[in-house]
Amino acid sequence: MPVPKPGPGEVLVKAHAIGVAYFDMLIRSGRYPWMPALPYVPGNEMTGHIADANGTGLANGQAVYVANWDNDYKGGFYAEYLAAAATAIRPLAADADLDRAAALSNYVVASGLMDYGARGIEPKTMVIHGAAGGVGTALIELGRLAGAKVIGIASSEEKCALVTKRGALAINSSKESVAGRVNQLTGGRGADLICNHLAGNSFATDMTMLAPFGLVLSYGVLGGLPEQDLFRTMRSEVERCPALRCFTMHSFDHQPELRDRCTDKVLRLFAAGKIDPLLGPILPLGEAAAAHRLLEQRGVIGKILLKP
């Protein structure tokens, strides 16, 4: 493909590292609820250097981060060069770790969940499903920074070891009763916030694990839609005043300034060394299909990166 030419108000970024996201795979398979117009070059985030500032006030050679949602979801990130709106560009320090910075979108999602999806909740205790995943590990770090006691659910000893290393209490869902362990670890009080990307039948159990006035925050449906009468389940726990809220980054589409606040917060934490994005396999850009196969196996720990 030819190197794109930046239009008015755009810059050209030469890629250093490209983050691979789960919804890249959903777009490829046609299962993403917000499908873009086809043909479409996927990708969600990139770090790199300005190759052509195009009179925007940015500087050639400057280290930068850019996310797809800041560039009007135009895609094009699985490439050596990206033409992006100057307003989508986030400058990074010259000595920033550009590999780890290419995994920051997970933290932006985690910030959106905690700061807006869970608005009104100040969790003393939070439970995270899939705590060894990309968003899960980010939630552990942000939860701990917020002063919460964090309990992470994972499905293997290896993943539980990672959850523990990241500073959370781990529950092995393949060996333990999740509800029983949450009850034990919270002294019977339950969790103020439960972050759930699974949906399916897990919601019913989550309702029994909530503290009074607690919230189950749903941000995915990997397990499909729930089959139970969820309202009946919630009514059975009515003395706890349980709540369920659904979140997506598209919740910010009509208020992008809120998403900007999340990104700004994450970049500040990254620059200050307060968060440590976890990296997984790093593959050549030409092996994007292999990266998607790794994601589909759902055994990868850490963010998959592509390198031009």
Predicted regions: what is each one?
Residues P2-V20, R31-D70:
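Glycine-rich beta-strand-centered segment in the early N-terminal region that forms part
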Residues G57-L58, G120, L210:
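Short, well-ordered loop/turn sites that connect or cap secondary structure elements
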Residues A63, T125, K149, G214-L215, ...:
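Short glycine-centered segments of the SAM/dcSAM-binding site in methyltransferase folds
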Residues Y65, V127, I194-C195, L217:
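N-terminal Rossmann-like NAD(P) cofactor-binding module of classical short-chain dehydrogenase/reductase
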Residues R100-E176:
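Mid-domain Rossmann-like dinucleotide-binding core that forms the NAD(H)/NADP(H) cofactor-binding site
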Residues V178-G188:
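Short amphipathic alpha-helix with an adjacent loop that forms part of the alpha/beta core around
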Residues N201-K274, P308:
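Glycine-rich phosphate-binding loop and adjacent beta-alpha segment
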Residues L267-R268, A272-I282, A289-P308:
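C-terminal capping/lid region of NAD(P)-dependent oxidoreductase domains
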